[in-house]
Amino acid sequence: MFSKEDLKGPSHAVQLGVFVDEALSFVDSHGMPLDAVAVSCGPGSYTGLRIGVSMAKGICYGRNLPLIGLPTLEVLCVPVLLHHDLPEDALLCPMIDARRMEVYAAVYDRALSVKREIAADIVDEHSYLEFLNEHPVYFFGNGAAKCRGQITHPNAHFIDDIRPLGKWMFPLAEKEMVRQNFKDVAY
């Protein structure tokens, strides 16, 4: 696995090609086999997703590799599951800022089984009550901070500084590789 971060801000279009070139050069120069390419398939910035998916498809097509698409919200769950001690009945609610008071969010259990599908939500004090009334719910991702003032239920917990980094894709991509759940690079 190759991972590199740039925390300077949204420069996806500028940096991605350079990062990919470095990764492929490293793999090639060290004789390492490349088994597949994993890419985030959203939700998120439409332009950013198009750039990332196009780059991934190009690599897969050129090297005859399978493509693995992973939901960004599931990727956000990985560091929470790895680095936070959650109760058995905890639910995870990753959130991505969708501007204004809207977030892209889903609800998962600790096994990443979907409890509520991905949706664009306008958050208010009644949001997620069907889950909060029954379980501790952990909110995280860049959309969670703006919801802190609206979601005040005692079962609501907020985790800061969770970002969708490439390194968090690995355990999910590995599962998809075993299942041979690949995306079509032609479309």
Regions inferred by a protein language model and the residue ranges of each:
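DPxDG-like acidic metal-binding loop motif
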Residues: 38-72
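Residues at secondary-structure transition points
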Residues: 7-18, 46, 50, 54, ...
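Surface "functional belts" at beta-alpha junctions
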Residues: 11, 66-164
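Acyltransferase
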Residues: 115, 157-187
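N-terminal beta-alpha supersecondary unit
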Residues: 1-43
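Stable alpha-helical structural segments in soluble proteins, enriched in small hydrophobic residues
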Residues: 23-27, 62, 80, 169-177
